[in-house]
Amino acid sequence: MSGFYHKHFLKLLDFTPAELNSLLQLAAKLKADKKSGKEEAKLTGKNIALIFEKDSTRTRCSFEVAAYDQGARVTYLGPSGSQIGHKESIKDTARVLGRMYDGIQYRGYGQEIVETLAEYAGVPVWNGLTNEFHPTQLLADLLTMQEHLPGKAFNEMTLVYAGDARNNMGNSMLEAAALTGLDLRLVAPQACWPEAALVTECRALAQQNGGNITLTEDVAKGVEGADFIYTDVWVSMGEAKEKWAERIALLRDYQVNSKMMQLTGNPEVKFLHCLPAFHDDQTTLGKKMAEEFGLHGGMEVTDEVFESAASIVFDQAENRMHTIKAVMVATLSKLNN
């Protein structure tokens, strides 16, 4: 793990394919050690700040449990718990927290915010999610894919992302494919494709690593032979209702359902989702969607697929913690370098 100590974790393309693989290997080892009761605390005495300008269940729990497992202490600064960007500039916040903490996680808005924190904090800064990138999620996804196809290299796997691919998930998937050589297919209406410049950059890198990146509106063509089908929510609670109708009309044909799974022609195809998922009407938003748009069987994914044997979303959710732990150990522990 040489080269990781005191390094930031802001986006995947900051790393080489070898570095990404070493992080995944460390995550697998830390997971195995925890399961067998052999985990060694390498972050004892470390203090970690968790800045959340956007709430999250999985990201917060993953960072907190990972830190506690490794002997570190955390301070949670929620959306109303800090003055970042309001009464105190990001630059000043970084310099203050950097004097008190050994590492800082940021989950919130623009990528420029986490980049500024990294520039001025003087300690490792980790991107828990920005509008542009979600690198910790992709680490968990890659580990999950390795676990479910242990005999295959990434450049022998086909990953399909169906839905709105112009968000942080789409961008980070492009970066992951660039580094691993995945056969990545973004199956989405053209209005939901990522920025062309990032696609071009990542496609060239992916091809160097034995992979390919395809963007298509054709569901049947896009999912053929897939090993994994991935999706994410179409709408968020904070968005205007007018956006809901527009987004659902745009994406309805890209719902992950039993037909899409069958179109892969692969009886072993697995389903991935970064969660939370609107697969039923058991949530406030899910219920509203069902009532207003007739999506009673699920929105971006049907309940049938979500609850099927093909669904590995909870393996994926657990792996958030193990991979985040690997990032913290690699960047904060001299014992691991």
Curated annotation (Swiss-Prot):
It catalyses: carbamoyl phosphate + L-ornithine = L-citrulline + phosphate + H(+). GO terms for molecular function: amino acid binding; ornithine carbamoyltransferase activity. One of its GO terms (biological process) is L-arginine biosynthetic process. Transmembrane segments: none annotated. Gene3D superfamilies: Aspartate/ornithine carbamoyltransferase. Pathway: Amino-acid biosynthesis; L-arginine biosynthesis; L-arginine from L-ornithine and carbamoyl phosphate: step 1/3. It holds the Pfam family OTCace_N. NCBIfam families: orni_carb_tr, PRK04284.1, PRK12562.1. This is Ornithine carbamoyltransferase. It comes from Shigella flexneri.
